[in-house]
């Protein structure tokens, strides 16, 4: 039995990379999923809640390249950049769409602005599936 995260799926003992579709926009989150050979916790590591946190983004990207299923137990979800909207627009810490700081709007609102919806999506579709968040 594998692990499903939105439109992405990974089998036990496998690694997959792709783009997680967001239901409220055409933006997609770059994600790497690794399902270890043994059962264990589900861990989320992300970069780019603030889109100019380049060290975190690079760290997640490097980790995603290096880690393999035999290196972990459980499931590792790596979101390389969460605030892709702000990253693409080169804003420092806010979404270009609405000027909001993603880190300040959790748990979000499914009927709110772009950033509110992104926070809501993270809460409902991702945070709800993890045991630990780094």
Show the residue positions of the predicted features.
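Structured catalytic-domain cores with a bias toward divalent-metal coordination
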Residues: 1-134
């Amino acid at each position: 039995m594998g692990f499903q995260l939105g439109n992405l799926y990974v089998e036990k003992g496998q690694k997959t990379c792709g783009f997680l579709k967001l239901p409220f926009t055409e933006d997609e989150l770059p994600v790497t999923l690794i399902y270890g050979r043994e059962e264990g916790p589900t861990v989320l590591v992300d970069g780019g809640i603030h889109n100019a946190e380049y060290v975190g983004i690079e760290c997640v990207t490097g980790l995603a390249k290096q880690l393999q299923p035999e290196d972990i137990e459980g499931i590792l979800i790596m979101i390389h950049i969460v605030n892709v909207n702000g990253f693409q627009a080169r804003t420092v810490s806010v979404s270009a769409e609405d000027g909001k700081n993603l880190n300040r709007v959790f748990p979000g609102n499914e009927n709110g602005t772009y950033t509110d919806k992104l926070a809501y999506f993270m809460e409902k579709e991702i945070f709800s599936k993890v045991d630990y968040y780094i």
